[in-house]
Amino acid sequence: MDEQRDTTDRFLPRFDAAGLVTAIVVDADTQALLMVAHMNADAIEATRATGQAHFWSRSRSALWRKGETSGNGLTLVEMRVDCDQDALLLRVKPAGPACHTGRRSCFYRRVEADGGLTFLADDAQG
């Protein structure tokens, strides 16, 4: 079946040993990278059923809906799967900052050649 994942028209996610796939989340309007998370079968089903992004928390071992406590939910515009069906791309409309720090994106620091971090001005806390 693995060799057919790149040619089939069926959604057949290839979960890792922990039952997860990587989910890359981008703003559907700006294409800005917002966050990377993990989804299990329940998170995928909940996202498809509700139109709101759900993920699996590895630290809490629990299903969670983005924005559940903050109100900064992610409305699904489109879900794509990569050629191996082991990673997902979620194009979303964010209702606020995607990062728990209050920033638009979780990727707000650049790693410099010397190993230092530079905070990016275009992703200031809001």
Swiss-Prot record:
Cofactors (names): Mg(2+); Zn(2+)
Alphabetized GO MF terms: magnesium ion binding; phosphoribosyl-AMP cyclohydrolase activity; zinc ion binding
Predominant place of localization: cytoplasm
Pathway: Amino-acid biosynthesis; L-histidine biosynthesis; L-histidine from 5-phospho-alpha-D-ribose 1-diphosphate: step 3/9
Enzyme class: hydrolase
Record: residues binding Zn(2+): C83, C99, C106
Keyword terms of this UniProt record: Amino-acid biosynthesis, Cytoplasm, Histidine biosynthesis, Hydrolase, Magnesium, Metal-binding, Zinc
Keyword tRNA processing found: no
Pfam families: PRA-CH (PF01502)
Note describing how the cofactor binds: Binds 1 Mg(2+) ion per subunit.
Catalytic activity line of the entry: 1-(5-phospho-beta-D-ribosyl)-5'-AMP + H2O = 1-(5-phospho-beta-D-ribosyl)-5-[(5-phospho-beta-D-ribosylamino)methylideneamino]imidazole-4-carboxamide
Subunit structure as annotated in this protein's UniProt entry: Homodimer.
Family label: Belongs to the PRA-CH family.
Purpose: Catalyzes the hydrolysis of the adenine ring of phosphoribosyl-AMP.
Name listed for the protein in its UniProt record: Phosphoribosyl-AMP cyclohydrolase
